[in-house]
A protein has these predicted regions:
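Short, amphipathic alpha-helical interaction segments positioned at domain boundaries
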Residues: 72-105
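Exposed, interaction-prone assembly regions rather than primary DNA-binding/catalytic cores
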Residues: 95-190
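Long, compositionally biased intrinsically disordered regions
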Residues: 179-187, 199-361
Length: 361
């Protein structure tokens, strides 16, 4: 029997973080716990203690397992920080009125996964960490992540994106990213809704001159080949509606690429390293490129896994009867080989060496 909780864990601790993520999403996926900061034994002890103290409970149905707040945890969080949690733990808000249907729960899990990876990448994602979305254009604090729920709160315009599969948007110094999470499943895209979301961002003037791109998260690199297959609902990923769409995995690799997408200067640093020994790229050439090798062949830096750009590179090489080199991280190589033709040669970067020498240096 869980004992009656008298107090919450301290703020700025992992137990409080887990309670916060659960409060904001409604249900936290069990499988995502291993992605929180800390070793497996410590994470297990945190979850065990929160259950024992009557703050979390496990909800399992139809093979899907998640953590939910107890009524005592809601009461304590509301008393501790009402300005943070009132919008989520009172009234008819979805995190406070949870349903048991699989599609609804999966959506909550996908939201939780993205909030976790944003937090791990040091991107402000909780509502109190950044300006409200309606005031984002006046705020200089970027990067910042806004959930689709926060975006919909702008007013009547928010109803235009009701059917979108986006989990939210990421504002960075390099532009705006509509963010999606396909998790382990194949995404059921809503083509018109996604384009309406893009149009809304353009008309609302959040970052008036910013380029709007997309990020889709998945569980493994193997899912990339599914995303790049012709499909009536997902062709907008490759049809030019979004000139850049990045595929990131929901793990430490994806967190690293996310950091790069948020930091233009760090990407430039990596590009300079990769360009060593190569000739300067040719702008507006018949084959998109970042550099030219000693034999005059194009080279593309593909470590961010911008798959429309990779597809354009591959298609142009085949069209013009040329060969070219695609530079990626070692963990991406096998999946990119699967989606590229014979004209593309792959060259990989050691990810662990990149972490040590560039990302956290």
């Amino acid at each position: 029997m869980p004992r009656k909780p008298w107090q919450l864990p301290a703020q700025n601790t992992l137990p409080y973080l887990l309670l916060t993520l659960t409060a904001l999403c409604g249900e936290y996926p069990i499988r995502q716990i291993s992605h929180l900061p800390g070793g497996s034994a410590y994470l297990e002890s945190v979850v065990t203690a929160l259950r024992r103290d009557g703050l979390l409970r496990t909800f399992s149905k139809d093979g899907l397992r998640g953590l939910r707040l107890t009524s005592s945890a809601k009461r304590l969080l509301l008393a501790d920080a009402p300005e943070w949690f009132s919008a989520y733990l009172t009234g008819s808000s979805e995190p406070n009125k949870l349903k048991s249907e699989i599609p609804r729960r999966l959506r909550l899990h996908r939201m939780a996964e993205i909030l976790t990876i944003m937090h791990n990448a040091d991107i402000p994602a909780f509502p109190w960490e950044k300006a409200p979305f309606s005031a984002a254009s006046q705020s200089a604090a970027i990067p910042a992540y806004y959930t689709s729920r926060e975006v919909k709160e702008i007013g009547p315009q928010g109803t235009k994106i009701k059917s979108s599969r986006a989990t939210g948007i990421l504002l960075t110094d390099g532009g705006i990213f509509l963010t999606y999470n396909t998790a382990k499943a194949q995404m059921k895209w809503e083509y018109k809704a996604e384009l309406r979301f893009k149009a809304l961002l353009q008309t609302e003037g959040v970052m008036p001159d910013a380029e709007i791109s997309g990020i889709v998260f998945g569980s493994t690199m193997e899912q990339l080949s599914i995303l790049t297959q012709p499909d009536a609902h997902s062709y907008f990923l490759l049809d030019g509606s979004f000139p850049h769409f990045y595929y990131l995995t929901n793990d430490r690799y994806g967190e690293a690429i996310l950091r790069l997408l948020c930091d233009t200067q760090q990407r430039r640093t990596l590009d300079v390293i990769l360009a060593d020994g190569l000739h300067e790229g040719i702008p507006n050439w018949r084959v998109e490129n970042d550099a030219i090798d000693s034999e005059g062949n194009p080279v593309l830096f593909a470590y961010t896994c911008d798959f429309p750009r990779i597809r354009r590179f591959d298609t142009a090489l085949e069209l013009h009867g040329m060969t070219g080199t695609l530079i990626c991280f070692d963990y991406q190589e096998e999946a990119l080989r699967e989606i590229c033709g014979q004209c593309v040669m792959l060259q990989s970067i050691d990810f662990q060496q990149f972490e040590r020498s560039v990302l956290y240096s």
